[in-house]
Amino acid sequence: MKFAVCVFPGSNCDYDTYYVIRDILEKDVEFVYWEEKNLSKYDVVVLPGGFSFGDYLRPGALAARTPLAQAIYDFAQKGKYVIGICNGFQILTELGLLPGALLPNLNMRFVCKWVNLRVENERSAFTRKLEKGDVLRIPIAHHDGRYYVPEEELRKMEENGQILFRYCDEQGEVKEEVNPNGSVSNIAGVMNKEGNVFGMMPHPERASEDILGSHDGLMLWYSLLSD
């Protein structure tokens, strides 16, 4: 399985993600840059975190209008795997590959801390090494991480099993007081209806080794590699 890690002007988690794939997972990986138009030689495309194009207009808006973004869209339409982390998640919603939008945090502040995530669907390509109800400890770092989707769309996503992670406490209880950004229904990560495109605001690449405080983020990569 060959990975591509996307690099836009302002990306800042690209090397972290590359390191996890190359040195921990020991998989073939290359950087691809914002002017790239051809992703045919890759099996998985990862959009890392950062502040692409300085978050001008709104996070992900300009990145979604690059040649690379069009290539990512075409790649996803072929059923290949696409993962968006933080700013990558924002870009995927701007592209229309994932439902909803990411709005400024409810407190209008940048939030950087460890959070707990509850697995909502263990049957996806990104969670099949996990069990429903498992709790992962993974950090967040964002200003615009408040996931929003209209109520009717949320209902359809629930029915389709598109919600993969929710913010919760250490015991796995989903509560308003542990929601770090005001996301609707405590949502932290979702996938498309087809099941090949996934986005999350927390950073699994920052929870990849015990020395960092957690290796829970590796389970997402291991799930994908078990395909």
UniProtKB/Swiss-Prot annotation:
SUPFAM superfamilies reported for this sequence: Class I glutamine amidotransferase-like
Active-site residue list: 86 (nucleophile), 203, 205
Principal place of residence: cytoplasm
CDD domains the UniProt entry points to: GATase1_FGAR_AT
InterPro entries linked to this entry: Class_I_gatase-like, PRibForGlyAmidine_synth_PurQ
Gene3D superfamilies cross-referenced by the UniProt entry: 3.40.50.880
Localization terms from the record: Cytoplasm
Pathway: Purine metabolism; IMP biosynthesis via de novo pathway; 5-amino-1-(5-phospho-D-ribosyl)imidazole from N(2)-formyl-N(1)-(5-phospho-D-ribosyl)glycinamide: step 1/2
Range of residues in the leader sequence: none
Record-annotated Glutamine amidotransferase type-1 domain positions: 3-227
Protein's name according to its UniProt entry: Phosphoribosylformylglycinamidine synthase subunit PurQ
Organism: Aquifex aeolicus (strain VF5)
